[in-house]
């Protein structure tokens, strides 16, 4: 029949992650396949807040999200994105022997700012020669259409 794939050889899987013994397509597996090596996240603090912190929705933050618990050093005076990346990469390279990194905008809601502020921050992170992508921590109610468009500008086809 036209358009059908050829039959698989014995022991061959339709999905390469199955051949690796995985039960699902893990993001780590995808990154290793795409870049040929380990890719590690570098946590960045761009100084964002959250509608549950600044009073727009509530005050005091969410009960499940205490940024101090997972990034205590990041809530101190901030370095530039470039300096945070350089510092984080230096630490992670020795710990994980990684050479490629995701810029992880971690604490708070990292789409909770005007597009004019977001774009240069994301561009600065992607300009680093060892950064291969972005990971952006946010809330689903803080990604309006204009933020979708900005994020779409950074996608790789």
Predicted regions and their residues:
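Short intrinsically disordered, low-complexity coil segments enriched in acidic
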Residues: 1-2, 157
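Distinct, well-ordered alpha-helical segments
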Residues: 115-123, 144-154
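Structural recognition of alpha->loop->beta junctions
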Residues: 62, 122-131
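Core AdoMet radical
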Residues: 68-88, 92-115, 130-143, 157
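Basic, amphipathic N-terminal segments that precede the first structured/catalytic domain
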Residues: 4-14, 127-134, 141-143
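Sequence-level detector for tyrosine residue identity
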Residues: 24-27, 96, 104, 112, ...
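Broad structural signal for hydrophobic residues in well-ordered alpha-helices, predominantly aliphatic
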Residues: 31, 92, 125, 151-154
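N-terminal [4Fe-4S]-dependent radical SAM core
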Residues: 2-63, 67-99
């Amino acid at each position: 029949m036209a358009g059908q794939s050829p039959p698989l050889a014995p022991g061959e899987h339709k999905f390469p992650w199955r051949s690796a013994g995985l039960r699902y397509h893990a993001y780590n597996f995808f990154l290793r396949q795409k870049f040929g090596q380990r890719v590690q996240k570098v946590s960045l603090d761009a100084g964002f807040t959250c509608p549950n912190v600044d009073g727009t929705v509530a005050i005091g933050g969410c009960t499940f999200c205490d940024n101090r618990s997972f990034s205590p050093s990041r809530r101190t005076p901030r370095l530039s994105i470039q300096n945070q990346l350089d510092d984080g990469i230096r630490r992670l390279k020795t710990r994980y022997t990684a050479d490629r990194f995701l810029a992880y905008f971690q604490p708070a809601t990292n789409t909770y700012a005007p597009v004019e502020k977001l774009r240069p921050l994301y561009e600065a992170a992607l300009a680093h020669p060892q950064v291969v992508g972005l990971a952006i921590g946010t809330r689903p109610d803080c990604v309006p259409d204009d933020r979708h468009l900005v994020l779409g500008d950074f996608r790789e086809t």
